[in-house]
UniProtKB/Swiss-Prot annotation:
Protein name from the UniProt record: Endoribonuclease SymE
EC number(s) given by UniProt: 3.1.-.-
Record gene name: symE
Location in the cell: Cytoplasm
Record-linked NCBIfam families: PRK13605.1 (NF010128)
GO cellular component entries: cytoplasm
């Protein structure tokens, strides 16, 4: 049996009523058959306020009766050195050895 100390107290809701939005599923036409497919359009300044600025990548999780949209954090820009290493990794083994030899000479390790 549950003791009074293990019962969670009610807390404030995670989503306040002022943050709720009500939408209607509309439709879009699918060319060339012009069949109706369900569509939901989201727009408004509230999107930016919620962290969904223009150009933000969004993860979409779909469950029965529930869609969860999550803004992805922007990826940090890759340094010029890392971009160069990525290019070198695509070279042939012989060319990679030449690049490694050059790096060794510049670093004074050989």
């Amino acid at each position: 049996m549950t003791t009074p100390h293990s019962i969670a107290e009610s807390t404030d809701p995670e989503v306040f009523p002022a943050n709720n939005r009500h939408l209607t599923v509309s439709y879009a036409s699918s060319y060339p058959e012009y069949t109706r497919i369900p569509a939901i359009t989201l727009k408004g300044q509230w999107l930016e306020d919620a962290g969904f600025t223009t150009g933000t990548q969004v993860d979409v999780r779909v469950m029965n009766g529930c869609i969860v949209l999550t803004a992805q954090q922007p990826q940090p820009e890759e340094s010029e050195l890392m971009q160069s290493l990525r290019q070198v990794s695509k070279l042939s083994a012989r060319k990679q050895k030449q690049v490694q030899a050059f790096i060794d000479v510049m670093a004074g390790s050989k």
